[in-house]
Regions:
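FIC/Doc superfamily catalytic core
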Residues: 1-66, 78-537
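Minor-groove-contacting beta-hairpin "wing" of winged helix-turn-helix DNA-binding domains
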Residues: 69-75
Length: 537
């Protein structure tokens, strides 16, 4: 099969000739190819493309203005004015490129923004504060209601360069010393995560003395004690007092949470989020009397019966246009690839075949866990095997776009329409390791179902199918807890995604847990509920 074309193409109009359109598109595709960048691309007029090249691309909705002569490349599958996904993907690349172009190296994020970024906070700030001595204080308006607050201010003595996007940040220890007490109380998860990242005492003590951070040092030491790192706290305090540096220790938090040190911010963040979310999930659990004990034969029967509905709903949630007759043909096993491709888009055909194979592997793994294999709490270890099954047809027919089956993603992974920026791909293994430890230790299957779904989606361990695997894992744990295999119907998909987005951005998991509980209950007694969502009561 011919490999699917992946370059950006659009039909041109508004009086732009085909020659102008083609030349502009070729120039843009060459830039993207040279950068190895398919998402998040930033274009500066006059530097990257000429005005004659930019004009047709703007007219044709390929480039979208940010400010001045800066543009981002739109998502070719959606309309930019309806979906901010492409802007979210481009945001941090723009910030780094724009500020470098204006100020060279004379800028950095504010101390608070530096800590939020270091803490693996995936949210895009509505207003980003940066410091520079090269400009007066002013605000730069950005798309979708975002702002860049440029503050005229000196820079810290040392500025650190961040590799993922090219940002310039406060050094970690200086940022913690410099932030106001309100940061600890408004952003306790991020503050605790950064305290867990702190290096040895020498650099911290030196930064405190050099900057004269008497009050900040007291908060830092008190914060370390609060998170359970008394050893480092005492060492820093001893170094400061030996240097005759006055410090009054105070706990900047409203309560203590013991986390211990960790060199990976996302690992600490996941553990803190789990601790915060778990009680909320338990409060939304369905009543125990609704649970049943599934036999292996009943699990197989249920999964066989539900596959077509599950595939239609789950693939649609991932943006695929898969028809019932295609799913029915694949599930029936009597099909020919070329024939299916005459009736549907090839990518939809391949992904349906792949999902069927992944679903069957999930079924095998669940039955194995019920008949003497490793317990269901270990099923998250099988995600890469499920990924391999999903990707095999795509790889066979040249549709995998370079993605490696049975491996964590090797590139950025963005979520359509979300303000959450998933884990940097380099840190995905560490994030999954932290999640694994939490899932294995958790004895409540409903908690594993909800938080497993959430964190797999939050991390996005693979480029293609993370949402699919999150829901497959959720259902594996629902079965383990005595709940039925649960399908999120098409008419509820948007509300379900909104609850998931709320959890990603705000950390509030209750709505998501409530919807999973309700859909699970509805799978038991659908005729009695008449499809009424409790959110509508």
């Amino acid at each position: 099969m011919k490999k699917k074309e992946r370059k950006i193409t659009h039909k041109m109009d508004f009086g732009v000739t085909d020659e102008q359109a083609g030349a502009a598109m070729d120039a843009l595709n060459k830039i993207l190819e040279d950068r190895g960048q398919s998402t998040g691309a930033i274009i500066l007029g006059g530097r990257d493309l000429s005005d004659d090249q930019i004009t047709p691309l703007v007219i044709n909705d390929t480039l979208h203005k940010i400010t001045g002569r800066w543009y981002y490349v739109g998502d070719t599958k959606t309309k930019a004015w309806k979906d901010p996904s492409a802007w979210h993907a481009a945001y941090w690349y723009f910030v780094a490129d724009y500020l470098k172009e204006r100020f060279g190296k004379d800028w950095c994020l504010s101390s608070e923004q530096s800590l939020l970024f270091n803490a693996a906070d995936g949210r895009i700030p509505r207003q980003l504060a940066i410091r520079t001595p090269q400009a007066d204080t002013h605000v730069v308006d950005l798309p979708w209601g975002y702002e860049l607050l440029v503050v005229h201010s000196d820079l810290p003595e040392k500025v650190e360069y961040e590799r993922r996007f090219g940002l310039r940040l406060y050094p970690l220890e200086t940022a913690i010393l410099a932030v106001s007490p309100g940061f600890y109380q408004m952003n306790p998860m991020e503050a605790r995560t950064c305290l867990g990242l702190l290096p040895g005492r020498k650099g911290i003590a030196e930064a405190a003395i050099a900057g004269g951070y008497h009050i900040g040092a007291g908060r830092l030491v008190g914060g370390l004690i609060s998170v359970g790192n008394e050893l480092l706290a005492e060492a820093i305090l001893s170094s400061l007092r030996n240097s005759c540096f006055d410090v009054n220790v105070c706990d900047p938090f409203l309560g203590s949470v013991k986390i211990g040190p960790d060199s990976c911010a996302i690992a600490t963040r996941i553990r803190l989020m789990w601790m915060r979310m778990r009680p909320a999930v338990i409060s939304e659990m369905p009543d125990d009397f609704l649970r049943t004990s599934w036999s292996p034969s009943k699990v197989k029967e249920r999964m066989d019966d539900v596959f077509q509905d599950d595939a239609a709903a789950s693939l649609a949630m991932e943006g695929y246009d898969v028809k019932e007759n295609l799913i029915r043909a694949v599930a029936g096993g009597e099909w020919e690839y070329g024939t299916l491709c005459k009736e549907a888009e090839e990518t939809d055909v391949a992904v349906t075949i792949g999902y069927h194979e992944a679903f069957r592997q999930v079924q095998t793994d669940i039955l194995d866990s019920m008949t003497g294999g490793r317990g269901p709490e270990h099923l998250h270890h099988r995600i890469l095997d499920w990924h391999e099954r999903l990707m095999k047809p795509l790889e066979q027919h040249g549709l995998n776009d370079g993605e490696i089956p049975h491996d964590y993603r090797q590139c950025e992974g963005f979520i359509r329409g979300s303000e959450h920026i998933p884990v940097w791909w380099i840190n995905v293994p560490f994030a999954m390791m932290a999640l694994s430890g939490l899932l294995i230790q958790e004895d409540n299957a409903f908690v594993r179902a909800v938080l497993g779904l959430f964190f797999i989606d939050y991390i996005r361990p693979v480029r293609t199918g993370s949402g699919l695997f999150a829901r497959l894992y959720m259902n594996s744990q629902l079965l383990a807890g005595g709940y039925p295999w649960t399908v999120i119907p098409a008419n509820e998909a948007r509300a379900f995604e909104e609850s998931l987005e709320k959890a990603r951005v705000t950390g509030e998991i209750s709505d998501l847990a409530r919807k999973i509980a309700w859909h699970s209950l509805n799978s038991f007694v659908a005729p009695k509920l008449n499809g009424e969502d409790p959110e509508q009561d």
